[in-house]
Amino acid sequence: MLDSTRIFMKAFHLLLFDGSLIFPECILIFGLILLLMIDSTSDQKDIPWFYFISSTSLVMSITALLFRWREEPMISFSGNFQTNHFNEIFQFLILLCSTLSIPLSVEYIECTEMAITEFLLFILTATLGGMFLCGANDFITIFVAPECFSLCSYLLSGYTKKDVRSNEATMKYLLMGGASSSILVHAFSWLYGSSGGEIELQEIVNGLINTQMYNSPGISIALIFITVGIGFKLSPAPSHQWTPDVYEGSPTPVVAFLSVTSKVAASASATRIFDIPFYFSSNEWHLLLEILAILSMILGNLIAITQTSMKRMLAYSSIGQIGYVIIGIIVGDSNGGYASMITYMLFYISMNLGTFACIVLFGLRTGTDNIRDYAGLYTKDPFLALSLALCLLSLGGLPPLAGFFGKLHLFWCGWQAGLSFLVSIGLLTSVLSIYYYLKIIKLLMTGRNQEITPHVRNYKRSPLRSKNSIELSMIVCVIASTIPGISMNPIIAIAQDTLF
C-alpha cells in the first residue's frame, strides 16, 4: 500500500511540474475524455458535435504547439520525454495530417453507417501516440507510444467488419505489427545490455563509451534488428508486404490517415534512434538505409505500373516515396538533409491526402476503386478530375508543382552529401512514377465515349460551390500541392531551424 502511494505521489509530482511541456497532448486527452462522456451520457448521437469536438481539439493542440515554438529544449518526466524544435515540427505534421483526415471521413461514415464516436476516438488516440513517439527519449516510451498508434491503426483498418478484405487486412497488419514490435524490443535489449543498463538515448551513448562496447558485435546485431523493426513502420522494401493489402482492404479515409501519419511518426523516431545511440556506427546504418532506399524506389515504382486498383497503386507509390525520404535521413543535418526531408514530408502530406480525398469522393459516388473506371471522368466532373490530376502530377514531381521543388531540394542535398548513385536512382524512378501517373491522367481527360464505364456514365456531377467536407479538404490539399513549391524558401528556413 505504501509503495503504491509513493508511486502515485511521484506520478502526480511529475505531472504537476512537467505537465505544461505536454500541453498539446493534454488537449487531445481532454478531447478524448469529452467524446467518451458525451457518447456515454447522450441517447441521441449528434454527429456534427462529435466532429466539432475532434477538430477543435486538434486545432487547439496545433495552436498550443505553435505558441510553445520558441521555448528552449527541455527533457521532462525523468528523461522519458524531450521537447525541442525538431520533435515539435514532426508533432505539427502529425496534427496537420489528422486535422485534414477527419473531414475526409464525415460523408464516408454517414454513407457506410459506421460507428462515429469510436472512429474519432481511434483517430485522436493514434494521433496522441504519434505525438508522444516524436518526443520519446527512452526505450520504454519509444515502445509504448508506437504501440498506442499501432493498436488504433489495427482497429481502424478493420473498421468495416462485414468486409472480408478489411478483416484480411487487419489480420496481416496485426501479425506483422506484433512481429516487428518483438524484433524492436529484442534490439533494445542488446543496446540496454551493451550500454550498462541505460535506457535514455543520450545516456546510451555515454554508457557505450564507458563500457567500450560501441564497436562490439552486439551493437551491429541491435542495428540490424532496429532497422527491421522500424522498417515495418516506414514500410520500405522489403518490409512492404503488408502495405498493399492494408491499403486495399481498409476504409479509404483510414488509408489516407495511416499513409501519412505513420510515415511522419516513424521518420521522426528513426532519425533520432539512428543518429543518437548509433552515433559510432554511422557508416553501417547509412549502408543499410541506402539499400532500403534503393529497393524501395525501384520496387515501389515498378510494381505500381502493373496495378489496376487506385489504392494499391498508391500503396506501391508510397513505398517509392519513403525511399526519397530515407535520402534525407541518410544525409543528416550536415548538408540540410533533415530540412529537405521535413519540407518534402510537408508537401507529401498535401499531395497524398489530396489524392485520397479525390478517391474517397469518386468511390462514394460510383462504388468502385478500379483505375479503368476513371475513364472520361473529366466529361462528368472537371473539378474532381483536375484536382486528382494536379495531385498526381505533384506526386510525380512535375514543375512547377510543390512535389517538384520538394524532390529537387532533397536530391540536391543528397548530391552535395556525396550520394550521387542514390540520387541517380531517385531521379530515374521519379521519371518512372511520372509515367504511371500520366497514364491515369490521360484516362481521366481523354477517355472516349466507348471507353467510359457505367460508373462514370451514371456519375452525379457535383456543384461548383459545395459544402461537402471532403471537397473542402480536397481544395486545401490541392492548393497546398501546387502553390507552396514556387515560394518554398521560407518553408526550408523554418525546417532548418528545427535541427537538434
Curated annotation (Swiss-Prot):
Protein name listed in UniProt: NAD(P)H-quinone oxidoreductase subunit 2 A, chloroplastic
Protein's cellular compartments: Plastid, Chloroplast thylakoid membrane
A GO-annotated cellular component: chloroplast thylakoid membrane
Stated role: NDH shuttles electrons from NAD(P)H:plastoquinone, via FMN and iron-sulfur (Fe-S) centers, to quinones in the photosynthetic chain and possibly in a chloroplast respiratory chain. The immediate electron acceptor for the enzyme in this species is believed to be plastoquinone. Couples the redox reaction to proton translocation, and thus conserves the redox energy in a proton gradient.
Membrane topology according to the record: Multi-pass membrane protein
InterPro entries documented for this protein: NADH-Q_OxRdtase_suN/2, ND/Mrp_TM, Ndh2_N
Sections of the chain in a coiled coil: none
SS bonds (residue pairs): none
Family: Belongs to the complex I subunit 2 family.
Lineage top rank: taxon: Eukaryota
Quaternary assembly: NDH is composed of at least 16 different subunits, 5 of which are encoded in the nucleus.
EC number: 7.1.1.-
Family annotation (Pfam families): Ndh2_N, Proton_antipo_M
PANTHER family assigned to the protein according to its UniProt record, in alphabetical order: NADH DEHYDROGENASE
Record GO terms (molecular function): NADH dehydrogenase (ubiquinone) activity; quinone binding
Keyword Translocase part of the UniProt annotation: yes
Catalyzed reactions per annotation: a plastoquinone + NADH + (n+1) H(+)(in) = a plastoquinol + NAD(+) + n H(+)(out); a plastoquinone + NADPH + (n+1) H(+)(in) = a plastoquinol + NADP(+) + n H(+)(out)
